[in-house]
Every structure is written in C-alpha cells, then in structure tokens.
Amino acid sequence: MTDLYIDADACPVKAEAERVAVRHGVRMFLVSNGGIRPPAHPLVESIFVPEGPDVADMWIADRARTGDVVVTSDIPLAAKVVAAGALVVKPNGETLTQANIGNALATRDLMADLRSADPFRQGSGRPFSKADRSRFLDALERAMRKAQEAGRSASGGSEAGS
C-alpha cells in the first residue's frame, strides 16, 4: 500500500499534498519537529519528532519503501529514500530518481562549497510561485499513480480494488 511522507518543516505544499492523498485514498504522514497545525482528515497524520539535526529525515528514511512517495527539498534525504525504492517530488515539482539523484547531490555539494567560500553571498533562489505549485500538483499526481502501480507489483498484485 502506498504511503505519502511529507518533510513538513517549511514545506509550502502541505495542503496540496493532502488533497492528492485524500483523492487517492492513501495515508499521508506530515513529519516535523512541531509548529504545524494538526490535520483534519483521518488519512493524514502528524508525526512530531524530537528537535535535532535530521531527526525528521531519519524518521522518513527508516519507513519509505517501494510504492511510497516522499515530498522533500532535502537532497540527502531524497537520496536515501530513492535508494529504498520510493519516489521523490520536490515542492517545485521536480522529481528525483535513480537517474538524477547523483547529479542533484553533486550540485548541492558544489553550491554549499560556493556559499562557504563567499560569506557575503545573499539569498540563493527565487520565491515560490503559482507555477511551482502547479508543477508540484502535476508531478505528485503522476508520482502517486506510478507509486501505487509499483506497490501493487511489489506485493504481487494482491491489493485488489486499489
């Protein structure tokens, strides 16, 4: 069965992800160290983890598997869950796969090196837009369909009626 995991701290698309999860009838886990409003829908569960570096990421990485979808901007977390067989969608609609996760990790490391070399470098990106939100919804919808199919295949097709 497909689960949807949201790396919820500072995630701008929680409401959109919830709509997609409810439409597909899948459980959604909002994983954070607090500060988010509890969900109203019974398919959506808030998971509050202790504060600390990467605690929410570790919670997600320990559970995500083939047939699941993870929404995160965290590239190291994405690498872990892609290795476990999960599909990854970033809030801007970009998907991360076995084919592109190595490049994403290398780019992340390069940008971290550039930022550390120039302490006066300000802001690194453009604001989140309606177009990003639209791309996210489209990418998440496609990922959910693909994950549900992968989940059925991984379980030998035993999820009749899904």
From Swiss-Prot:
Family statement drawn from the similarity comment of this UniProt entry: Belongs to the UPF0178 family.
HAMAP family: UPF0178 (MF_00489)
Protein name per Swiss-Prot or TrEMBL: UPF0178 protein RSKD131_2223
